[in-house]
């Protein structure tokens, strides 16, 4: 479902960090001239530009950015050189944030450097405490834009004062800047929060809790369509669907190790009589309980368990972002219990499942990452033999099946290495879509076993399998990719019937009923409004097909069809139309 970008917008733009870092100095130089009592914070280059933090005497309005830009351009035209200077005489008066950084670097014994913007006469226009990384002259700074204002706590600590952060971006060429500004506007149009609200897909309420999404009718239609495909594929690949409680006793997560490793992202326990119940952040411990509910034989393995699970994870309120970052989420989770000799076959089986799943949703894999541990003994379970065995097994599987991959040290789960399938979204973000995680640890912690052919008790291995991440994040990605214009089979707004006037409503309901009986997402707009208004609203709500019913259609027992995004209508009989949309649904168009 990777919708191609417009020919006019290039999301693969390049941002030069040295150019942007120098532009941040230019911004600070202009600010100091315009607001002499300002206090300077940091001004680094970032992924898509730069920012600089300031403490102003009075609040800064966005309208003032144009005035600041104007002075920046004037300074840039002076061909100021960026020169490393001796900072021994640097005046820290009214510069508490610079002084704090200076003292910190000095205490650590780190190199301290200063850079100045110097005019053609050798006069220092602006000097800053800085580690370097610049272009040699402001003559390179011709195409930049100050983009926005934001609040930012000093050093990222909410206990500190909130400074004013000015964001901007700088490019060498005019067309590069123009393209980037188009990217920003396109991102606004693709904001899943805006689209989701406008199309009635989801909502939030402070009364139901921050970060707890409410799925509306259209959102549930999308979610159920996705879920239907996932459930079918799970059955196809041999999974047994189970359902486990939303809570776990605190001792469960102590035993699993999750409380020790993920306590900051888990909700606090709820004391009920003599129990401490925690909203579950994952289902793997619950699935181990299911495995251990009965004696197991080697003949039963692999045992594949899947669940459409509701999870709860604590996110700070500032990190919550629409459906993308929430505190409760639905996840299609899978856990497979296997024998040692089944590792290769089962991991390959899961690779095939992931590839088939992503193909259905037309999602292209950007790259595969083999995530391994690093030397952090606190971050990862300390058992060298286990790790070496697990990591070499996954590497061998990828190599033998000629699957290209990159190695990412330190990105493994605390209990074992993993294979991550990375996807590039239409907004050029790389995200982990699917994962296969090999786990030698949890089965040991819970002392689960199976009876081997020789009658001995053996410990199974466990594979954690993720297909599409959470439904919340997946739908947010689909909204961004499609701008809400879903492919027909996934659309919550497949067909709407629009009678032109009252006298055609009976025939319109007849059409509606026949389409509804074929299990399509169909609506009827029988309001006493003009047909033009009905069509306009149907287009806004992205109905894939609008069926217009008037005198001619009623007399000829036909329908007039207008497709989303098109002006012309096509007349056909209802049976042919139903066959057409059945074909679209079945072929996943």
Swiss-Prot record:
EC number(s) recorded for this UniProt protein: 6.1.1.3
PROSITE patterns noted in UniProt: AA_TRNA_LIGASE_II
Catalytic activity: tRNA(Thr) + L-threonine + ATP = L-threonyl-tRNA(Thr) + AMP + diphosphate + H(+)
GO CC, one annotated term: cytoplasm
Name listed for the protein in its UniProt record: Threonine--tRNA ligase
Principal location class: cytoplasm
Cofactors named for this entry: Zn(2+)
Cofactor binding annotation: Binds 1 zinc ion per subunit.
This protein's encoding gene: thrS
Cited Pfam families: HGTP_anticodon, tRNA-synt_2b, tRNA_SAD
Function of the protein: Catalyzes the attachment of threonine to tRNA(Thr) in a two-step reaction: L-threonine is first activated by ATP to form Thr-AMP and then transferred to the acceptor end of tRNA(Thr). Also edits incorrectly charged L-seryl-tRNA(Thr).
Binding positions (Zn(2+)): 284, 335, 464
Region annotation Catalytic: where it falls in the sequence: 191-487
Organism: Mycoplasmopsis pulmonis (strain UAB CTIP)
Subunit structure: Homodimer.
Example GO biological process: threonyl-tRNA aminoacylation
Keywords attached to this entry: Aminoacyl-tRNA synthetase, ATP-binding, Cytoplasm, Ligase, Metal-binding, Nucleotide-binding, Protein biosynthesis, RNA-binding, tRNA-binding, Zinc
GO molecular function: ATP binding; metal ion binding; threonine-tRNA ligase activity; tRNA binding
Broad EC category: ligase
Location of the protein in the cell: Cytoplasm
Alphabetized HAMAP family for the sequence: Thr_tRNA_synth (MF_00184)
Highest rank taxon of the organism: Bacteria
Family of the protein in this entry: Belongs to the class-II aminoacyl-tRNA synthetase family.
């Amino acid at each position: 479902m990777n919708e191609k970008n417009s020919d006019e917008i290039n999301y693969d733009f390049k941002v030069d960090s040295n150019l942007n870092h120098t532009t941040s100095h230019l911004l600070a130089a202009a600010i100091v001239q315009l607001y002499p009592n300002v206090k300077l914070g940091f001004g680094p280059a970032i992924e898509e530009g730069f920012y600089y933090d300031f403490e102003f005497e009075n609040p800064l309005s966005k309208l003032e950015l144009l005035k600041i830009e104007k002075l920046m351009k004037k300074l840039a035209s002076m061909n100021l050189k960026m020169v490393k200077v001796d900072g021994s005489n640097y005046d820290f008066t009214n510069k508490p944030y610079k002084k704090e950084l200076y003292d910190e670097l000095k205490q650590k014994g780190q190199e301290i450097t200063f850079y100045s913007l110097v005019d053609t006469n050798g006069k220092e226009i602006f000097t800053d405490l800085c580690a370097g990384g610049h272009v040699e002259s402001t003559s390179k700074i011709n195409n930049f834009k100050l983009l926005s204002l934001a609040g930012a706590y000093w050093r990222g600590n909410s206990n500190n004062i909130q400074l004013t952060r000015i964001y901007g971006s700088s490019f060498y060429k005019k067309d590069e800047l123009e393209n980037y500004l188009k990217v920003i506007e396109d991102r606004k149009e693709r904001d899943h929060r805006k689209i989701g609200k406008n199309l009635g897909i989801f909502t939030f309420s402070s009364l139901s809790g921050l970060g707890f999404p409410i799925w509306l009718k259209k959102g549930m239609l999308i979610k159920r369509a996705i879920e239907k495909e996932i459930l079918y594929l799970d059955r196809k690949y041999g999974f047994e669907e189970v359902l486990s409680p939303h809570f776990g006793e605190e001792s469960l997560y102590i035993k699993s190790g999750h409380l020790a490793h993920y306590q900051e992202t888990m909700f606090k326990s709820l004391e009920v009589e003599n129990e401490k119940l925690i909203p579950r952040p994952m289902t793997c411990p619950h699935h181990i309980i299911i495995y251990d509910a009965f004696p197991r034989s080697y003949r039963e393995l692999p045992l594949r368990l899947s669940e459409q699970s509701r999870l709860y994870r604590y996110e700070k309120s500032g990190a919550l972002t629409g459906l993308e970052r929430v505190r409760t989420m639905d996840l299609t989770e899978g856990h497979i219990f296997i024998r040692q000799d089944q590792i290769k076959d089962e991991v390959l089986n899961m690779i095939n499942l992931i590839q088939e799943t992503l193909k259905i949703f037309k999602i292209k894999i950007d790259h595969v990452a083999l995530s391994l541990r690093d030397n952090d003994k606190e971050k990862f379970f300390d058992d060298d033999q286990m790790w070496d065995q697990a990591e070499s097994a996954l590497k061998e599987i990828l190599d033998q099946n000629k699957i290209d991959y990159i190695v990412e040290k330190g990105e493994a789960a605390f209990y074992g290495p993993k294979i991550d399938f990375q996807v590039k979204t239409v907004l050029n973000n790389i995200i982990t879509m699917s994962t296969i995680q090999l786990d030698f640890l949890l089965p040991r912690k819970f002392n689960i076993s199976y009876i081997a052919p020789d009658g001995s008790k053996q410990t199974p291995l466990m594979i954690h399998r993720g297909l599409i991440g959470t439904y919340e994040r997946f739908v947010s990605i689909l909204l961004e990719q499609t701008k809400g214009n879903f492919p027909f089979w996934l659309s919550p707004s497949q067909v709407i019937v629009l009678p032109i006037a009252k006298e055609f409503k009976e025939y319109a309901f007849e059409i509606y009923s026949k389409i509804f009986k074929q299990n399509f997402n169909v609506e009827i707009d029988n309001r006493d409004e003009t047909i033009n208004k009905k069509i306009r609203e149907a287009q806004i709500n992205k109905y894939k097909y609008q069926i217009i019913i008037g005198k001619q259609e009623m007399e000829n027992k036909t329908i007039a069809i207008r497709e989303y995004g098109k002006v012309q209508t096509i007349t056909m009989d209802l049976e042919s139309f139903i066959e057409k949309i059945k074909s679209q649904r079945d072929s996943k168009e």
